[in-house]
A protein has these predicted regions:
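Polyanion-binding surface elements
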Residues: 1-20
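Short helix-start
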Residues: 8, 31-55
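Major-groove DNA-recognition helix of helix-turn-helix-type DNA-binding domains
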Residues: 15-39
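Conserved class I S-adenosyl-L-methionine
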Residues: 59-100, 114-118, 138, 145-146, ...
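C-terminal alpha-helical "lid/dimerization" subdomain adjacent to the S-adenosyl-L-methionine
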Residues: 78-81, 201-272
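Class I SAM-dependent methyltransferase SAM/SAH-binding core
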Residues: 106-160
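A conserved beta-strand element that flanks and buttresses the S-adenosyl-L-methionine
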Residues: 172
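A short glycine-rich, Lys/Arg-flanked "PGG" loop and its adjoining helix->strand segment in the class I
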Residues: 184-196
Length: 275
């Protein structure tokens, strides 16, 4: 029989979200619960009834939907994302001269390892973080086939990474942020785990109006205005923040077992931010 009274950890699991996201719900959405001393307790029935009402379902579903989508498409991701991973990013990483042999680099939303596998030879260690276990298995398979041995994988919500404060030298986030329910929370997590003097390299979509794309790719955001995102980095505490639009043709993305183009005309930008 299921427990009727739940701890915060058990309640977050019921919602299908991270502890950090659940705490935000507690503060903003009046989740039914009772604080006894320093501990929270929740009625399973009350939570289920709350989840069944109104827009609250979106919060619990968002992380689960993204995870299920990427678990499903992982075996075909090399074809689906063929033109989603811009080769120009590799050139920019080299041009910026920010990869060092002594570095521990975290790749948030690593997917099948487009960034992880490229950067691994240039750094001491890569920690590839993704919410999808199937994607990480694809990454591991491809890394092994390529003889790459310095990538660790970590299945985790990238908004709540189980890494110590100021413990890594660099964070990469390629085509990750538009899948996140709360982008500013993700920026705060990047700031938390990177060392003083460390750097974040982010690539994402310029804002667009392609609703069909968002539905097919389970995007939470229609890209971003880079100026607003730069302001978000600065609010989070990053000291030196720069962005540029990538040159070249717009991104083309494919979705489905028989690849079918679903995006044209969407540009990509990068942000480089030092703590």
């Amino acid at each position: 029989m299921d427990k009727e009274i739940l701890t915060m950890e058990e309640a977050a699991e019921l919602f299908g979200v991270s502890i950090k996201t659940f705490i935000k719900l507690l503060k903003e959405e009046k989740v039914p619960g009772r604080k006894i001393g320093r501990e929270w307790r929740f009625s399973r029935l009350a939570l289920i009834n709350w989840l069944a009402s109104g827009d609250s379902q979106a919060y619990s579903a968002s992380e689960t939907e993204v995870k299920e989508f990427f678990n499903k498409v992982a075996p075909q991701w090399e074809e689906i994302g063929r033109n989603y991973s811009d080769e120009t990013l590799k050139t920019k990483l080299i041009e910026l001269n920010i990869l060092k042999k002594s570095m521990i680099l975290v790749d948030l939303g690593a997917g099948d390892g487009f960034i992880s596998r490229f950067t691994a030879p240039f750094v001491k260690k890569v920690i590839a973080v993704d919410i999808s276990g199937e994607m990480l298995r694809e990454l591991g398979r491809k890394a092994k086939a390529g003889g790459i041995k310095n990538i660790e994988t970590l299945e985790s919500d990238a908004q709540d990474v189980p890494l110590a404060d100021s413990s890594v030298d660099m964070v990469c986030a390629n085509m990750y942020l538009h899948h996140i329910e709360q982008p500013e929370l993700a920026l705060q997590e990047m700031h938390r785990i990177v060392k003083p003097g460390g750097v974040v390299f982010l690539a994402d979509l310029y804002e667009h109006s392609d609703g069909d794309l968002m539905n097919k790719m389970h995007d939470r955001w229609p890209g971003f205005d880079p100026d607003q995102l730069v302001a978000g980095f600065k609010r989070t505490g990053f000291q030196d923040v720069r962005y540029e639009m990538l040159p070249g043709p717009p991104v083309r993305t494919y979705c489905g077992s028989t690849p079918e183009p679903v995006r044209t005309g969407t540009k990509v930008f990068i942000i480089v931010a030092w703590k």
